[in-house]
């Protein structure tokens, strides 16, 4: 069988050498292909479950406009998840099974999403910190040498801009009162630590290998710094002890905690997974599939 032809391009910042463009995942070196499949599944699962958390606040939001925003963001995340699940067919995974047939321990969504979101400040922490972390990771694929990935992420990123603006506006609103700042403190501290860790360790060879292959444009440490720079000004309004401003810009005042961390799933190893009844049954669409006889 003749292998698919590939094109070439000149990489910037690397001395002008010619680098191969990959036309499909099958053309990737095996370690990079495996690492990218893991990453896409993490992103797909996290977006799908995050969509449920947004949907839960369509009717319970503080304002009508916020409820409408939650509806739009939920639809966005589900659409993005479907795009990513479909891509995993090229990595030897069954999108139908991924979407509808897995239990809690098989999901790779952030442990921040394992339990229902009980308060608006908790949802706001997910909106500003976790949602933006996903966007920073996906932005790193914008100029990917894997052409199908490069083309798919553009639509996702176009829709994600609104999510950040919504989060930034509501964080400023909460920061305007003592009660608001007090309410956001603990949710932001919890989400900050989880998201800081979510990008992975700079010593993670698989994640760093994706950057070396040009599948993403930066390794875990650089992506974490991008995320901090983006969200820190808003975080400083409600929980200033988490961040610090230096001559070089914003940084985290706390270091990532790697105890119990699984770099492949980007979850804590002892985290149980999303609640099966309250969250996953809806993610999978169990009730609707039962009505349809599936």
What spans do the regions from the language model cover?
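Conserved alpha-helical segments that form or flank metal/cofactor-binding pockets of metalloenzymes
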Residues: 3-4, 73-101, 167-172
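Alpha-helical scaffold segments that form or flank carboxylate-/histidine-based iron centers
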Residues: 34-42, 61-80, 123, 148-160
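Acidic/His metal-coordination segments adjacent to aromatic residues that form catalytic metal sites
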Residues: 21-41, 101-127, 144, 177-178, ...
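Acidic, low-complexity proline/glycine-rich segments
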Residues: 2-23, 44-45, 95-107
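Internal, conserved structured core segments that host functional sites
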Residues: 113-166
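Generic structural signal for well-ordered, non-transmembrane alpha-helical segments
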Residues: 45-48, 75-82, 128-132, 154, ...
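Helix-loop segments that flank and shape redox-cofactor active sites
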Residues: 50-72, 134-150
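Extended, helix-rich structural scaffolds rather than catalytic motifs
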Residues: 182-294
């Amino acid at each position: 069988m003749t292998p698919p032809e590939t094109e070439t391009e000149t990489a910037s910042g690397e001395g002008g050498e010619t680098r191969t463009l990959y036309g499909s995942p099958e053309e990737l070196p095996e370690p990079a292909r495996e690492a990218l499949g893991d990453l896409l599944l993490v992103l797909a699962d996290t977006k799908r479950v995050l969509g449920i958390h947004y949907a839960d606040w369509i009717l319970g939001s503080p304002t009508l406009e916020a409820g409408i925003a939650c509806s739009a963001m939920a639809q966005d995340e589900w659409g993005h998840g479907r795009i990513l699940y479909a891509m995993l067919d090229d990595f030897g995974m069954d999108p139908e099974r991924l979407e509808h047939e897995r239990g809690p321990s098989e999901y790779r969504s952030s442990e921040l999403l394992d339990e229902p979101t009980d308060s608006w400040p908790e949802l706001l922490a997910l909106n500003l910190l976790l949602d933006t972390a996903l966007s920073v990771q996906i932005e790193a694929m914008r100029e990917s040498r894997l052409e199908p990935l490069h083309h798919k992420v553009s639509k996702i990123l176009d829709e994600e801009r609104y999510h950040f603006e919504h989060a930034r506006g509501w964080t400023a609103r909460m920061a305007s009162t003592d009660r608001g700042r007090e309410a956001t403190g603990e949710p932001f501290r919890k989400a900050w630590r989880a998201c800081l860790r979510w990008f992975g360790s700079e010593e993670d060879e698989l994640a760093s290998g994706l950057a070396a292959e040009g599948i993403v444009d930066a390794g875990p440490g650089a992506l974490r710094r991008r995320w901090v720079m983006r969200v820190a000004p808003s975080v400083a309004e409600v929980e200033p002890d988490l961040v610090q401003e230096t001559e070089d810009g914003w940084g985290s005042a706390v270091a990532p905690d790697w105890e119990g961390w699984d770099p492949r799933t980007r979850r804590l190893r002892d985290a149980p997974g999303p609640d099966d009844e309250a969250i996953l049954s809806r993610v999978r669409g169990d009730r609707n599939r039962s009505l349809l006889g599936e």
